[in-house]
Amino acid sequence: IKEYIVSLGSKRLLERKRILTGVDLSINAGECFGIVGRNGSGKSTLLRVLAGIVEPVEGTIITRGTLAPMLGLGVGLEPELTGIENAKLCAALMGCDRSGTQRTTENVRSFSGLSEDDLLMPVKRYSSGMMARLGFSIATANDPDILLVDEVLAVGDAGFQRKCYERIEGMKRRGG
């Protein structure tokens, strides 16, 4: 893909460079992999393309199953809404009915480790660790087939990181 850098004032093209070339990737159910590279090498851009956030200039992306991208702290969360309201909104966007939405919110409550007061507070007041807890809990609440994570779990405490790793291992065992 080509990435465009735009000056905020004039909206004029400052630079154009090719970020990803010759990417050919096939991942099977239950596989887990990491993308390693130097800063600026296109790792995050590749994840945004896989998530459907950025359109490739050429080639195709084929995904089968439900996709849950976690590509930054707070990305996809509405800052004015509470944690629970965000969980309900995400469940609705994923096509959950009323009982599915209730299951999602209960899953978020139990997995995130956030207090009820925290979950009833607007997300804009969350710390980075709280944001990671909420985001990961929402993203994995309905056991997605594909989970894309971009450095989000680098924040927060070691106990929650271990809990996330265990949840990912469980998803892998179930073929997700």
Where are the model-predicted features located?
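Helical segment within the ABC ATPase nucleotide-binding domain
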Residues: 161-174
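A short, proline-enriched helix->beta-strand linker immediately N-terminal to the Walker B motif
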Residues: 133, 137-149
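Helix N-cap at the start of a conserved alpha-helix in ABC-type nucleotide-binding domains
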Residues: 157-159
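Pre-NBD coupling/linker segments of ABC/ABC-like ATPases
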Residues: 1-22
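Conserved A-loop
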Residues: 24-27
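Conserved ABC nucleotide-binding domain
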Residues: 98-125
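ABC ATPase nucleotide-binding domain signature region
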Residues: 29-33, 38-94
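ABC-type ATPase nucleotide-binding domains, specifically the catalytic core motifs of the NBD
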Residues: 5-8, 88-101, 111
